[in-house]
């Protein structure tokens, strides 16, 4: 998934009233477990020196916030998921594989194919490679995303080979996603334009750091997160495909395009899950939607680190924003799409808290667009450059 989302300023209205407390029409949350780090916020340099820890402090982590009766909903939906979610998977024998889009190492013309690929890549600017490498690194952290899905109560793979529809989906989705990082990694390696060792270090750091999507082991929150992220990923890869085409590399455009197509198909599955939850449990679902948007959808790679730059994700996101690969406008567009896709404005019979949550998500898009306008204005005044280790410390504009 590059499961991707932009870093956004903390400028959204507070929705703390959507969390905790009793709710009519929606079961109260289970007593959450709050996990606090023993490292002070701001001690970035000290944290970065410690092995196998994120490059900076993360916030409080809440776990197991879903009441037991809500977990039963997901168990009751296993048959529905078999009929409605697993259909969005492709049989392995009908799936594309990375080798379909790469030079054939068994062919006599292999070296000529590689030379042609490298020649095409020379026409592509460094800032594009920063965006593409960031996407690839995000895809390569797939073990973290499977782990995240298996933290969700009621849908996790309890044995590692469970035959429940939720577990089958998670494993098969992971298997499909695994091709994305493989393909981009090999393609970038063959270009000769990037520092593969620095990229590989970044991947190892990222998988070791994990991710903190703030989904609380709660599948309501988790599937809203994945619905948003899969659409964001499809947009991002679609835009890198468009840029590659503009630069004259039609093969790379095809690579990015086929990945975007996969992400779009996965998005359909996740949005369908939330659609079903809105049908059977609208109050809890709209509360979860507002909760995730209040917390802001963070990119799974927000703990990205290359051993040098503590703010690597922020810098990578700035390049992606400037290039139009993924922007604050896209973030707002995705939210607008999901509000319409799930008919959130039309929900009725909600509790008072549910109506507040409904109003929050339905009026949030214009506020995000204002944030985008300010960000665009700041970008025009910018001119800051940054050296990226991924491209042999060459400078690009942020």
Curated annotation (Swiss-Prot):
Pfam family of the protein (one)? FA_desaturase_2
Task: Give EC number(s), comma-separated.
Answer: 1.14.19.11
Q: What is its main location?
A: plastid
Q: How is the cofactor bound?
A: Binds 2 Fe(2+) ions per subunit.
Task: Report the locations given in the UniProt record.
Answer: Plastid, Chloroplast stroma
- GO molecular function, a single term: stearoyl-[ACP] desaturase activity
Q: Which cofactor does it need?
A: Fe(2+)
Which positions in this protein are listed as binding Fe cation 2? 177, 230, 263, 266
Q: Which GO terms describe its cellular component?
A: chloroplast stroma
Alphabetical GO biological process terms: fatty acid biosynthetic process
Instruction: List positions binding Fe cation 1.
Output: 139, 177, 180, 263
Its UniProt entry gives the catalysed reaction(s) as: hexadecanoyl-[ACP] + 2 reduced [2Fe-2S]-[ferredoxin] + O2 + 2 H(+) = (4Z)-hexadecenoyl-[ACP] + 2 oxidized [2Fe-2S]-[ferredoxin] + 2 H2O
UniProt keyword annotations, A-Z:
Chloroplast, Fatty acid biosynthesis, Fatty acid metabolism, Iron, Lipid biosynthesis, Lipid metabolism, Metal-binding, Oxidoreductase, Plastid, Transit peptide
**Does the keyword section mention Transmembrane helix?**
no
Instruction: Tell me the route in metabolism or biology where this protein functions.
Output: Lipid metabolism; fatty acid metabolism
Tissue specificity is: Preferentially expressed in the flower labellum. Low expression in leaves.
- Transit peptide located at 1-29
InterPro entries, A to Z? FADS-2_CS, Fatty_acid_desaturase-2, Ferritin-like_SF, RNR-like
- Catalytic class of the enzyme: oxidoreductase
* Function, in words: Converts palmitoyl-ACP to (4Z)-hexadec-4-enoyl-ACP by introduction of a cis double bond between carbons 4 and 5 of the acyl chain.
**Subunit (UniProt):** Homodimer.
The Swiss-Prot or TrEMBL record describes its family as follows: Belongs to the fatty acid desaturase type 2 family.
Q: What is this protein called?
A: Palmitoyl-[acyl-carrier-protein] 4-desaturase 3, chloroplastic
This protein's species is Ophrys sphegodes (Early spider orchid)
Gene it is expressed from: SAD3
């Amino acid at each position: 998934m590059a499961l991707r989302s932009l870093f956004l300023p903390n400028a959204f209205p507070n929705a703390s009233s959507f969390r905790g407390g009793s709710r009519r029409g929606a079961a109260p949350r289970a007593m959450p477990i709050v996990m606090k780090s023993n490292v002070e916020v701001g001690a970035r340099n000290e944290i970065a020196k410690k092995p196998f820890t994120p490059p900076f402090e993360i916030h409080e982590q809440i776990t197991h916030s879903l009441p037991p009766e809500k977990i039963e909903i997901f168990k009751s939906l296993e048959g529905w998921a078999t009929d409605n979610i697993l259909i969005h998977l492709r049989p392995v024998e009908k799936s594309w594989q990375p080798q379909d889009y790469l030079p054939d190492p068994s062919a006599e013309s292999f070296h000529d194919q590689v030379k042609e690929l490298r020649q095409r890549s020379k026409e592509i600017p460094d800032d594009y490679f920063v965006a593409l490498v960031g996407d690839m690194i995000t895809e390569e952290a797939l073990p973290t995303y499977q782990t995240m899905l298996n933290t969700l109560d009621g849908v996790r793979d309890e044995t590692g080979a469970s035959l429940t529809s939720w577990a089958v989906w998670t494993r098969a989705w992971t298997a499909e996603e695994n091709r994305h990082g493989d393909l981009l990694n090999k393609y970038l390696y063959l270009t000769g334009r990037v520092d593969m060792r620095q990229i590989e270090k970044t991947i190892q750091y990222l998988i070791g750091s994990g991710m903190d999507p703030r989904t609380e082991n709660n599948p309501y929150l988790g599937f809203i997160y994945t619905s948003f992220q899969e659409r964001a990923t499809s947009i991002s890869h679609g835009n890198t495909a468009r840029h590659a085409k503009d630069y004259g590399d039609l093969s790379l455009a095809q690579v990015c395009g086929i990945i975007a197509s996969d992400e779009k198909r996965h998005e359909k599955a996740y949005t369908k899950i939330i659609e079903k939850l809105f049908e059977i449990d609208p109050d809890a679902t709209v509360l979860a939607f507002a909760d995730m948007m209040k917390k802001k959808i963070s990119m799974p790679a927000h703990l990205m680190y290359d051993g040098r730059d503590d703010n690597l994700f922020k810098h990578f996101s700035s390049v992606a924003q400037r290039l139009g690969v993924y922007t604050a406008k896209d973030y707002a567009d995705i939210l607008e799409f999901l509000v319409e896709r799930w008919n959130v404005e039309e929900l009725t019979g909600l509790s008072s808290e549910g109506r507040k949550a409904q109003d929050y998500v339905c009026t949030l898009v214009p506020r995000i667009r204002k944030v985008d306008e300010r960000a665009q204005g700041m970008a025009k005044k910018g001119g800051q450059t940054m050296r990226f280790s991924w491209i042999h410390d060459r400078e690009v504009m942020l």
